[in-house]
């Protein structure tokens, strides 16, 4: 049973005094899917952020960007915050009810994509039987191979060989199926020290684009994505591909704790 039945990221709002060599060990010790270190802006953004998983740094990841936007923009009453990332400036548009932020939409970097050639081996390691939709690798910072299965029950039943999967590929495997009024998604990223990710914005945007490119939805159609159920951390994201060059992902976040972290 997860301690928190939601997706957790931690944000160091001023990381200037944390030595560079401590960033990765600290993220590994905290062991959340992502740890964010915030610095003064270097360019035209409001702040610069660096994102670490337990095993490495990412140039971009959706879930921690939304969380960081809520943490930083909340007290400032901003309607939009521009965050500098390894993939450039990411604008996050915020929706409020009174002083409280209830939702955020981020403009995502445009991914590049290509066919994933060792598809048969990946499906063997996942224990998955794909549909006829092509397996394609999308890179938006971290890469994800999108794998459609025939039903949400098949997605729920997946039990990958994580050790072999981590040795086989550096990217994540994003397995999905249509489930009534939404899409069910599970994302496995053992190479980054995250066997299963509870919420993956950097896969949600590419999923909307993938579905639109292959005619499963129309460009401009908003989809709801549910993820994290099997690991006790259910999440909901929304995504829309307005074109191949314009992708937005949205979700909600709240601050559940504040405090000081004292480094020895």
Give the label of every model feature segment:
Residues 1-60, 66-264:
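Active-site proximal loop and beta-alpha junction motif in alpha/beta enzyme cores
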